[in-house]
Amino acid sequence: MLSERARISTIVGLFANPILSFSAVFGNDFWRFGFELTLDLVNRIITKANTVLSLITEDTTTTFSIDKKASLFTASYYQRLHSKTVCGAEAKYILSDKSNSFSIGKRHLFGDDDLIQALLSVSNGGSMRVLFQHHWTLKSFFTIAGERLLNHSSQRFGLAVEL
């Protein structure tokens, strides 16, 4: 830990191809800037390079990121509507195939203790996702999730219990 407003981390992985990973986050209560860089020490190439800038207020978070060695650009915006509801939107641009994606979503907490949450998201690719989750304790919960690909008429459904 560098200070209250900055964090720096370095990792050296001793594998068949040793890596050196360096990440840092700087900021204050209104903005944060972070980056991550991973080097393959044998081949002397950059295997990972990510950077992110976040602007934060009491009820909103706006984030801009450049990931996968500048091949993925993402912008996201989250707005707290009230204490139990959050809405968000995310736009992505993939440089390699020049494709865009956009999704919007909402999360709502239920009950006096906020142990039940529901999430709904829709994307321009024609997918709709729903998740319901009930926390019994801090680390135990039950989840029901589903996804429907509207343009392919396919769906997925899942149940999970973690104790």
Swiss-Prot record:
GO cellular component: mitochondrial outer membrane
Alphabetical list of InterPro entries matching this protein: Porin_dom_sf, Porin_Euk, Porin_Euk/Tom40
Disulfide bonds: none
GO molecular function: voltage-gated monoatomic anion channel activity
Domain of life: Eukaryota
Pfam hit, one: Porin_3
Signal peptide positions (record): none
Gene3D superfamilies found in the cross-reference section: Porin (2.40.160.10)
Family per similarity comment: Belongs to the eukaryotic mitochondrial porin (TC 1.B.8.1) family.
Name of the protein: Putative mitochondrial outer membrane protein porin-like
